[in-house]
């Protein structure tokens, strides 16, 4: 089986994984240490990120530059369609592998990390799970190699966390659906060649009247708003999608009418593992920066790392990071084992995003004045971390999800 797997493998990423069939199911927490194949994957992604992303990350951030060439190379490695089956031109790997790879990319450049996350989790994810065979061929295969990327249009100007309150509408007209409304905060919007859009097809049914659609970009009736000038993740584009009598074929309905809310929620469960992994990368980069600086900066006749106060800070940073990483891996492995993971993905996203914010904050504190200037990357990590507590469900939403599952478990 392993030989056949490798014979079908494509690209340097798969060749780096060795001879074991690494799609074996994992027993959650059977070992704190990663399987050898996943360790090799981590090193491959780290080498790529250090060569291709670290040298340009500050420039991408400063000039709001989309990393076109690097995204293409990531597609060639298989990083843009990691759990998509090989028959659809994906890498055919598992979600633990995806989490590990995304952390390494985000450690080098969080903007590139979210570009990767959106294409894998939010765009390809729902089509892979709910799409027809024809839709998978049309809307997945061309988006695996870096030539094209997709986006995900759920949030609206008047409802971000309240995903069931969509004001965008879709009505049937002959052989078409006609979309009207505005979607907000759409990542990858300016570079995307397609989007998954959620719109109300029956307002009387509230969230049970929401449906999902596949929309090519550009297309008549769809215009892009201005690129948002953001605090962080500045190399990824964020803009509104404005639908004005946007007509798409009837066969572009994803799933069945009224399934949109279910599709969105299950997609966000997957996406939260991605954002947790992005946050882990930011947190790890912040800790690396703080330790390196503290080791080389002398105060009172000794390196900062000799000061107990600095040691305590570093210990707390490492504790938060490792705890969040284990929660994230657990959520990924539950998904790989086809077990429920909604609560666990919310826990992972909450823990990792808050860890990234706290660790990047403390990194600046350790660097002092040097942490506040662009000469060092600590300030970029701090800016990039903040969004991880907001998008794909705020920290408050994650706590509601966790509490809901917790209370139901006590009542059952």
UniProtKB/Swiss-Prot annotation:
Its cofactor is FAD. GO terms for cellular component: mitochondrial matrix; mitochondrion. It catalyses: a short-chain 2,3-saturated fatty acyl-CoA + oxidized [electron-transfer flavoprotein] + H(+) = a short-chain (2E)-enoyl-CoA + reduced [electron-transfer flavoprotein]; butanoyl-CoA + oxidized [electron-transfer flavoprotein] + H(+) = (2E)-butenoyl-CoA + reduced [electron-transfer flavoprotein]; pentanoyl-CoA + oxidized [electron-transfer flavoprotein] + H(+) = (2E)-pentenoyl-CoA + reduced [electron-transfer flavoprotein]; hexanoyl-CoA + oxidized [electron-transfer flavoprotein] + H(+) = (2E)-hexenoyl-CoA + reduced [electron-transfer flavoprotein]. Pathway: Lipid metabolism; mitochondrial fatty acid beta-oxidation. It is found in: Mitochondrion matrix. Belongs to the acyl-CoA dehydrogenase family. This is Short-chain specific acyl-CoA dehydrogenase, mitochondrial. The gene is Acads.
